[in-house]
């Protein structure tokens, strides 16, 4: 430990006492000029452009760009990817939205079908499912082709051709 009350002018006036545990060392010592300046080097090395040949070799080749240069591009591409995911999610939800059907209809197989048809075909055997899909498709075609409501059990041809009035025997 160093005792702070020591005066630099009193170098040898008092011998250090071991009893108190402190040494009196001056904190500021005079500087000598010989220690301040280093001798000038005899040989000076000047770096020229010829020492940097590895950079010149890579000029013709493709250099990998730094990530810092493309920070904005990366952020924009991530934002576009995020927006694309949002758009796909909205479109998916729009297509798979649980549609509400009017009273007396049941939503099955992405269509609203009459509840009576559903009850009739669900009570039959499992092989009737193909007929069930056929009836649904005929129902949709008939609904699109005519202006009035048609039952799915009627064929489209029977509805389009109305029965002719009976001929009278008079003429």
Curated annotation (Swiss-Prot):
<protein>
    <recommendedName>
        <fullName>Neuronal vesicle trafficking-associated protein 2</fullName>
    </recommendedName>
</protein>
<dbReference type="GO" id="GO:0005770">
    <property type="term" value="C:late endosome"/>
</dbReference>
<feature type="transmembrane region" description="Helical; Signal-anchor for type II membrane protein">
    <location>
        <begin position="72"/>
        <end position="92"/>
    </location>
</feature>
<dbReference type="GO" id="GO:0098978">
    <property type="term" value="C:glutamatergic synapse"/>
</dbReference>
<dbReference type="GO" id="GO:0016020">
    <property type="term" value="C:membrane"/>
</dbReference>
<dbReference type="GO" id="GO:0031901">
    <property type="term" value="C:early endosome membrane"/>
</dbReference>
<keyword id="KW-0735">Signal-anchor</keyword>
<dbReference type="GO" id="GO:0032588">
    <property type="term" value="C:trans-Golgi network membrane"/>
</dbReference>
<keyword id="KW-0967">Endosome</keyword>
<keyword id="KW-0333">Golgi apparatus</keyword>
<dbReference type="Pfam" id="PF06387">
    <property type="entry name" value="Calcyon"/>
</dbReference>
<feature type="topological domain" description="Cytoplasmic">
    <location>
        <begin position="1"/>
        <end position="71"/>
    </location>
</feature>
<keyword id="KW-0966">Cell projection</keyword>
<dbReference type="GO" id="GO:0099072">
    <property type="term" value="P:regulation of postsynaptic membrane neurotransmitter receptor levels"/>
</dbReference>
<dbReference type="GO" id="GO:0032585">
    <property type="term" value="C:multivesicular body membrane"/>
</dbReference>
<dbReference type="GO" id="GO:0030425">
    <property type="term" value="C:dendrite"/>
</dbReference>
<dbReference type="GO" id="GO:0043202">
    <property type="term" value="C:lysosomal lumen"/>
</dbReference>
<keyword id="KW-0812">Transmembrane</keyword>
<dbReference type="GO" id="GO:0005768">
    <property type="term" value="C:endosome"/>
</dbReference>
<keyword id="KW-0458">Lysosome</keyword>
<dbReference type="GO" id="GO:0016197">
    <property type="term" value="P:endosomal transport"/>
</dbReference>
<keyword id="KW-0472">Membrane</keyword>
<dbReference type="GO" id="GO:1990674">
    <property type="term" value="C:Golgi cis cisterna membrane"/>
</dbReference>
<dbReference type="GO" id="GO:0030659">
    <property type="term" value="C:cytoplasmic vesicle membrane"/>
</dbReference>
<feature type="topological domain" description="Lumenal">
    <location>
        <begin position="93"/>
        <end position="171"/>
    </location>
</feature>
<keyword id="KW-0968">Cytoplasmic vesicle</keyword>
<dbReference type="GO" id="GO:0098839">
    <property type="term" value="C:postsynaptic density membrane"/>
</dbReference>
<comment type="similarity">
    <text>Belongs to the NSG family.</text>
</comment>
<dbReference type="GO" id="GO:0032051">
    <property type="term" value="F:clathrin light chain binding"/>
</dbReference>
<dbReference type="InterPro" id="IPR009431">
    <property type="entry name" value="NSG"/>
</dbReference>
<feature type="region of interest" description="Disordered">
    <location>
        <begin position="1"/>
        <end position="21"/>
    </location>
</feature>
<dbReference type="GO" id="GO:0048268">
    <property type="term" value="P:clathrin coat assembly"/>
</dbReference>
<keyword id="KW-1133">Transmembrane helix</keyword>
<dbReference type="GO" id="GO:0005769">
    <property type="term" value="C:early endosome"/>
</dbReference>
